[in-house]
A protein has these predicted regions:
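Beta-propeller-forming repeat regions
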Residues: 1-295
Length: 295
């Protein structure tokens, strides 16, 4: 399938996954949907519709107890002309059955709207803390944290995290005090990279990258080279891939350029044989790049 913005393996399956289909751009995604992709015994793939959802941009599967929930974020709800943002997006959800064989074009999964009014509903990040899963969702009207229903309950819990226009965000404990900081790309496809620290129950900005990062889009937050780090890539101007860490000796954040002139869209971290790697989808240079990160 083309127009893939998200792919998530179905829990407990042998290679079956869900994927967005026909999301090409904010102006060309009225026919977007989430599809079920299943490997065939003799090779190839079976592709079926799970649910048609215009402008679906990011989605995920979150576990709560023994149940699994689909959470899906539509960038907007419609438009009348190019770059029309007059119809804000929404967050949709549904309990996901363990057997997806019944779903197809004629019998689609029923979704429920759990939050409306999400202008430029772009950013998504899965959070796992103490075995519990939740999601950070970023839009022009702020950053929100969504918790799936607890076992035996039906309603989602949604918290207001930060009231700033945001494109993407991740949570990372940079300074090691046990409280995760909030790293934010702002505004929508914007040029600001900031880090907020939680004090007295609310987030306060403690760092902002001194240079504009035009069309910031790729983001990873987590361990890198054995320490908490933020990786950000941006698609215009210098088109750099950046790494941010916190220096405990100086009490200051530091930045490092990992690569230049590539224009990353997405970035993924993994460790193999004790070495740290980043895979970057460098859209502006038509390449998939593999980086081994060293000190």
């Amino acid at each position: 399938p083309g127009g893939v913005m998200s792919m998530v393996q179905v829990p407990g399956s042998d290679g079956q996954f869900l994927a967005t289909h026909k999301f090409y751009s904010p102006n060309d995604s009225k026919e977007a949907k989430i599809v079920i992709v299943t490997p065939k015994a003799q090779g190839g793939w079976e592709v079926r519709t799970l649910v048609e959802l215009p402008f679906v941009h990011r989605f995920d599967i979150l576990q709560s107890g023994s149940d699994y929930y689909l959470i899906a974020c539509a960038l907007k709800s419609g438009h009348e002309f190019k770059d029309d943002w007059s119809m804000p997006g929404k967050i949709f959800a549904a309990r996901l059955p363990k057997n997806l064989s019944e779903f197809n074009e004629e019998n689609q999964l029923k979704l429920t709207v759990i939050k409306e009014g999400m202008l430029k509903n772009h950013g998504y990040c899965r959070i796992e803390e103490n075995g519990q899963y939740s999601a950070l969702v970023c839009a022009e009207n702020g950053i929100f944290r969504c918790y799936p229903p607890k076992p035996g309950q039906e309603n989602w819990k949604i918290e207001d995290v930060l009231s700033v226009p945001a494109s993407d965000a991740v949570l990372v404990d940079f300074d090691g005090d046990g409280e995760k900081e909030l790293a934010v790309l702002a505004p929508f496809h914007g040029s600001s990279i900031s880090i907020y620290k939680k004090t007295a129950g609310s987030y306060t900005k403690v760092y902002e990258y001194e240079k504009p990062a035009e069309f910031a889009h790729a983001i990873y937050g987590g361990d890198l080279l054995g320490e908490p780090a933020l990786v950000v890539g941006y698609r215009k101007a210098e088109r750099n891939l950046l790494m941010f860490t916190f220096n405990k000796d100086t009490g200051k954040y530091e930045s490092r350029i990992l690569d230049e002139g590539r224009g990353p869209t997405n970035v993924y971290h993994f460790v193999k044989d004790g070495k740290d790697y980043l895979v970057s989808a460098n859209r502006e240079t038509d390449e998939i790049a593999l980086y081994e990160i060293t000190k």
